[in-house]
């Protein structure tokens, strides 16, 4: 991996870490469903235009639209509806750690299919222990934690991302990552409309500058620029080397949250985060021969 790719990946992790902060900022004025809807309403046409300019858009067949719809529902609509709702009830740091449970769910799916090995099993159990520490705050009174509802939603979010990953891997036999993501964004935006209607559409003309800045950051930087850079890196380096960078996101998020939101991670969040990320690394790292 060359130095340019290293720098771009580090920048991408900084941007994704900042997303948890800007979601918190956007939630000051907008409800979670409106924030998610407007984020992808802005991001979808931009990513579609990029893919069309770069290589043109492949036209899905009739049955493929159903598969794409399931992907969009799991990986965009429900994923971000739950994530934004979760961030009303949990900290940015907790959210950035718990979303990584997606790798554990993917590993569990592999175990169900008989792809078990001691390293992956150890990673699953280690991650589970870390998650329990974060959510319980080290007490047996598990459900007394102030962040329990948001934490559980983020674990559900991890499961949804795992569903998207597993189902999406089959579609990648025909479509490249960027095209698949562009279609998922577009369909996911449409499926977010009922959620926004349910909570009442917010009038974008009345948004304050903070909310506009949050939406621009989440849509242009997080959903378009960062994804384009991520897929660029995947074509210029092996996937394991690229994936390791994701483990920087919770660290960057904790630093940003401390200064921007005055969030102070407690001892159990810090230790639980380290254990969770270590477990995720064990489940995803390639075995050396």
Curated annotation (Swiss-Prot):
Pfam families: EamA
Domain (EamA) ranges: 14-136, 159-285
Top-level lineage group: Archaea
Keyword annotations: Cell membrane, Membrane, Repeat, Transmembrane, Transmembrane helix, Transport
Keyword Membrane listed: yes
Entry-linked InterPro entries: AA-Vitamin_Transporters, EamA_dom
Membrane topology: Multi-pass membrane protein
This protein's GO CC annotations: plasma membrane
Membrane-crossing residue ranges in chain numbering: 7-27, 33-53, 65-85, 92-112, 123-143, 148-168, 182-202, 212-232, 241-261, 265-285
Family: Belongs to the EamA transporter family.
Protein name, UniProt field: Uncharacterized transporter AF_0510
Protein's organism: Archaeoglobus fulgidus (strain ATCC 49558 / DSM 4304 / JCM 9628 / NBRC 100126 / VC-16)
